[in-house]
UniProtKB/Swiss-Prot annotation:
The record marks R16, K23, H260, T359 as: Transition state stabilizer. Pathway: Isoprenoid biosynthesis; isopentenyl diphosphate biosynthesis via DXP pathway; isopentenyl diphosphate from 1-deoxy-D-xylulose 5-phosphate: step 2/6; Isoprenoid biosynthesis; isopentenyl diphosphate biosynthesis via DXP pathway; isopentenyl diphosphate from 1-deoxy-D-xylulose 5-phosphate: step 4/6. The lineage of its organism: Bacteria, Pseudomonadati, Pseudomonadota, Alphaproteobacteria, Rhodospirillales. 4-CDP-2-C-methyl-D-erythritol 2-phosphate binds at D233, V234, H235, H260, S261, D282, I283, G284, T358, T359, T360, E361, F365, R368. The keyword Acetylation does not apply. Its cofactor is a divalent metal cation. This is Bifunctional enzyme IspD/IspF. The gene is ispDF.
């Protein structure tokens, strides 16, 4: 049983945002908004499982946003957010978690500190709500004029994730079917559940309009630094195989590559580059060739792991570049597919991925067609 499960609500159409593309699937610093949100929970060690609630028409977009993350199968939402949450909660019945956190898919800046405060509050009370105090002076208007000033003491802006003991919030949601309530804390209030206020975070903003998205992009461009690192790998040919795995794509050839895993020289070099950019060792440290678990393993999981470590540090991948060095096979016909696959594994847009090929003009082991080499570069943005 997963003790704490997260339900990410991402079934909305974003009518206030405008346009045909729902806001949660817009680009934010090279990744979809929803990707940032899902990754924040999927990489948190306090979370046992993550499930998204999506619109039936958005499955292809969702799969792009969720690629490479360890998530539960998504479920479809309903006509309203409240309906979507209830359907999502019901889908967790077999997991029967102790606690559930309900989060807006369009809040990509959720931090581990807020998540932890919500989880710990549920040890004390059946509900927990992250909030930030209202700082602006509040005015009540009437007929276009100021009627009076509202006392802002004890007034807060509610955020998500809103946390609850699972059994109690499920019962509360079923008890208010037909009532239109603004958030899950209101559902809990209606059921008489005590909801503790915990400190939220000013940056944990919800993207509702196009202007919100622009402000979110400014947040991503805030204090931080870009780090770059390189990676290099070599594998000899194995005549017992009839294809080479290169950057996640099988390339037909008279020989494959010899290695403990699938010997994907491109992904191995790139994994080392990403790990190097965050000073996290090398591929052999995380996936030692002496470990039988990685015998014949697909190398996409190595790169996905490196990407998840970047996310866990609050960072993002800016761009990656791979150069494959060989006489044969020809890389050109497969280059676009390789770039697309790398982008999918890392959850970044394809215009942040470069895959190139060159030869050594007949010199050295690659010139003698004994194997393939690859070198890679990765640039990563990390908060200060």
């Amino acid at each position: 049983m997963a003790k704490t499960v997260v339900l990410v609500v991402a079934a909305g159409r974003g009518r206030r945002f405008g346009g045909d593309l729902p806001k949660q699937y817009h680009d934010l610093a090279g990744r979809m908004v929803l990707r940032h949100t899902l990754a924040a929970f999927a990489t948190n060690p306090e979370i046992g499982a993550v499930r998204a609630v999506i619109h039936p028409d958005d499955r292809q977009l969702y799969d792009m946003a969720a690629a490479g993350l360890n998530l539960l199968e998504p479920v479809h939402g309903g006509a309203t957010r409240q309906d979507s949450v209830r359907l999502g909660l019901d889908s967790l019945k077999d997991l029967n978690p102790d606690k559930v956190l309900i989060h807006d898919g369009a809040r990509p800046f959720i931090d581990h500190g807020t998540i932890g405060r919500v989880i710990r509050a549920l040890d004390r009370h059946p509900g927990a709500l992250p909030v930030v105090p209202v700082a602006d002076t509040l005015k009540r208007g009437q007929d276009g004029f100021v009627a009076d000033t509202v006392d802002r003491a004890n007034l807060f802006r509610a955020q998500t994730p809103q946390g609850f003991r699972y059994a109690e919030i499920v019962a509360a949601h079923h008890a208010v079917i037909g009532n239109e309530l603004t958030d899950d804390a209101a559902v809990a209030e209606k059921a008489g559940l005590a909801v503790e206020l915990v400190n939220g975070a000013e940056d944990n903003v919800k993207i509702t309009t196009g202007a919100d998205l622009e402000r979110a992009r400014c947040l991503f461009d805030g204090p931080g630094e870009v780090r770059s690192a390189s990676g290099y790998d070599v594998h000899r040919f194995d005549p017992a195989k009839d294809a080479c795995w290169l950057c996640g794509v099988p390339v037909p050839h008279e020989a494959g590559l010899l290695g403990h895993s699938d010997a994907d020289v491109g992904l191995h070099a790139l994994t080392d580059a990403v790990l190097g950019a965050i000073s996290a060792g090398d591929i052999g440290h995380h996936f030692p060739p002496t470990d039988a678990r990685w015998k014949g393993a697909a190398s996409d999981q190595f790169l996905a792991h490196a990407g998840s470590l970047v996310t866990a540090k609050g960072g993002r991948i800016v761009n990656v570049d791979v150069t494959i060095i060989c006489e044969r096979p020809k890389v050109g016909p497969h280059r676009a597919a390789m770039a697309a696959r790398v982008a999918e594994i890392l959850g970044i847009s394809q215009d942040r991925v470069s895959v190139k090929a060159t030869t050594t003009e007949g010199l050295g082991f690659t010139g003698r067609k004994e194997g393939i080499a690859a070198q890679a570069m990765a640039s990563v943005w990390l908060p200060r």
